[in-house]
Amino acid sequence: MKRIAFVFSTAPHGTAAGREGLDALLATSALTDDLTVFFIADGVFQLLSGQKPDAVLARDYIATFKLLGLYDIEQCWVCAASLRERGLDPQTPFVVEATPLEADALRRELANYDVILRF
């Protein structure tokens, strides 16, 4: 079975990319157990709780990330450099447990996947 990586690199609520990526991730989890989630660049904002998408007339899908464990999606990485660049602390309580990785280590980890889907 192919190893699949889902990379979230866009901020939530500005486009439908994050919501569509999450939908694709949950659907793919029914077909394979070998998938991992990466949060890089502005995608790190997908991990923050307390967002108010109704202010921009968007649907609040961020809470759905909390369901990843129910779908047996347990491997989540977040780019430590992306967190620093955006003034976020790796100790921030995220909506899912994501392990910080430096950019070089994250690239090496991504190289282990057969398919990389970016949202």
UniProtKB/Swiss-Prot annotation:
The keyword Cytoplasm applies. GO terms for cellular component: cytoplasm. It comes from the Bacteria. Keywords: Cytoplasm, tRNA processing. It is found in: Cytoplasm. The keyword Glycoprotein does not apply. One of its GO terms (biological process) is tRNA processing. Heterohexamer, formed by a dimer of trimers. The hexameric TusBCD complex contains 2 copies each of TusB, TusC and TusD. The TusBCD complex interacts with TusE. Part of a sulfur-relay system required for 2-thiolation of 5-methylaminomethyl-2-thiouridine (mnm(5)s(2)U) at tRNA wobble positions. Belongs to the DsrF/TusC family. This is Protein TusC. It comes from Escherichia coli O139:H28 (strain E24377A / ETEC). The gene is tusC.
